[in-house]
Amino acid sequence: MQHIGFKLNDKEYTIPILKVREVIKSPTLTKLPLVPHYVEGVTNLKGRVLAVVNLKKLVGLEGKSLGDNIMVVGSDHIRFGFFVDSITGILNIDESQFFSPSQIKQLGCSIQISNRYVTMLDAKSLIPAEDLDGSGGKLFLDPDDPVNG
């Protein structure tokens, strides 16, 4: 299965490439009141509102730098973007590379690739379920998904 690799601080992560819609340069964001602490704001992406998340805050990493790129992902009727420090490339991963499940529920598992370990993210679990419930969850709905139309 193909994944796209990226870095947050000095740690490398991957996400299945089929969940990635695109990678864009960091646009101007509009701040919103009363959103979860990890939501940096929203932007207009091709005529659609896109919520942009600080993944470092969401997974408990230190660091104030947000990175220059935003990875736009979609999974199970939601769509959002998150800042990445850099893209490391495309990785071909097979199940024999799975190392162990992570203690953080948003993270999938660790994978050994050559001499390094990479953490695989579970796109559909990145946003906490409680933040998808109620009116706040509308921020993350994919407007192009017929279920949300």
Question: Predicted regions: what is each one?
Answer:
Residues 1-149:
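An acidic, low-aromatic, low-complexity terminal/linker signal
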